[in-house]
Regions:
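Nucleotide-state-sensitive switch-loop elements of NTP-binding domains
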Residues: 2-8, 13, 17-127
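Helical mechanochemical/support elements of P-loop NTPase systems and associated helical scaffolds
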Residues: 3, 68, 97, 136, ...
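Short, aromatic/basic amphipathic alpha-helical patches
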Residues: 47-50, 160-163, 305-313
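Flexible loop/N-cap segments at domain edges
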Residues: 295
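Short, solvent-exposed amphipathic alpha-helical segments in soluble enzyme
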Residues: 49-51, 105-107, 134, 248-249, ...
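A generic alpha-helix structural signal
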Residues: 23, 36, 76, 102, ...
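C-terminal accessory "lid"/substrate-recognition subdomains
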Residues: 142, 151-289, 299-300, 313-323
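Phosphate/Mg2+-binding loops and adjacent switch elements
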Residues: 78, 82-191, 195
Length: 323
């Protein structure tokens, strides 16, 4: 399954700079596709990214920048078929909302790891009453406060309060159930146009998850930084509702869950993708390894142990796994 991130935010907040810095810093060893969904006929940001990624192309053996104004899904399909990227970043127009892009990516079977809204800490006051800006924040589950070096601590705290207030009021909801699409959200800060690494930790491809499932007798590993990744194996005699109940009780310290599980009431194994409260499922053919769930977060040992105590079909081996 291809992973993706959607980058949204109002006009001039620094999306392109952040995206450029992010890919160069964290994904130079990956095959990355950049999709710029521009507003209007001329895409200046697309030209900037094309120049940057012509250099990354030589390093990572394949980074594609494609500017799409129309026929978004067909354009993304063309990228997938032609280049087979590992990760896709979509930068939306500053004048558009992110959720239609989110739905399109899911329709294409692409795992959306996060919808990131870049907020201009210095200039939020000047655009926070704009309805598009409000729905950009409401339709995201990761808010990144940019240009924090240009404001005081008091001003930054005021920005955080504004963002939280907008998020709570405009948090996008399921029209049928009235429940929020994103149960949880996080607020991060960018320094010098670079977002923190934790936003992107825990991005697993299916083959990596299968590799971990095969490796369940592996020796102890140490984890990087403060991000902990813990693996649980699931007993065979469970139903989909059991897995769903686990995901509904995930604490905020755990911001990603990946895995492949076999349940009695679904014919094929299910791929789980949980990211900051948002959950998606996809069936997977010909999976013969143990059912596995990978929990990723910050200082999560105690929370994962509590989950295993609450749900006796979760078994926690005594080792840690790092990417």
């Amino acid at each position: 399954m291809i992973q993706s991130f959607i980058i949204t935010g109002f006009l001039g907040v620094g999306k392109t700079t952040m995206l450029t810095n992010t890919v160069q810093k964290y994904f130079s060893d990956k095959k990355v596709a950049i999709v710029v969904n521009e507003f209007g006929d001329i895409g200046i940001d697309g030209n900037i990214l094309s120049n940057v990624y012509s250099e990354v192309l030589e390093i990572s053996e394949g980074c594609i920048c494609c500017q799409l104004a129309e026929e978004f899904e067909s354009g993304v399909l063309e990228i997938m078929n032609k280049y087979n990227p590992e990760i896709i970043f979509v930068e939306t127009s500053g004048a558009s909302e992110p959720f239609p892009i989110f739905l399109s990516m899911q329709n294409l079977g692409i795992s959306v790891e996060g919808v990131i809204c870049v907020v201009d800490s210095q200039n939020l006051d000047s655009y926070k009453d704009n309805s598009t800006a409000k729905y950009q924040i409401g339709g995201s589950n990761i808010m990144v406060l940019n240009k924090t070096d240009l404001v005081s601590n008091d001003e930054l705290e005021a920005v955080k309060k504004d963002v939280i207030a907008i998020k709570e009021e405009y948090n996008i909801k399921n029209t049928l159930t009235g429940e929020p699409i994103f149960n949880n959200y996080v607020i991060n800060q960018a320094e010098q146009g670079l977002v923190s690494k934790e936003v992107f930790d825990g991005v697993y491809r299916i083959d990596e998850i299968i590799g971990l499932a095969k490796d369940y007798k592996h020796h102890d590993h140490t984890t990087k930084d403060s991000i902990t990744q813990k693996v649980a194996y699931l007993k065979a005699d469970i139903e989909f509702a059991d897995v769903d109940e686990v995901l509904k009780t995930i604490p905020k310290s755990i911001y990603r869950v990946k895995g492949v599980v076999k349940v009695k009431d679904v014919p094929n194994p299910i791929v789980i993708n949980y990211s900051f409260g948002n959950v998606s499922f996809e069936e997977l053919d010909e999976y013969t390894q143990p059912s596995i769930m990978i929990f990723i977060g910050e200082s999560i040992d105690n929370d994962v142990n509590l989950l295993c105590e609450k749900f006796d079909f979760l078994n926690m081996p005594k080792f840690r796994v790092s990417k």
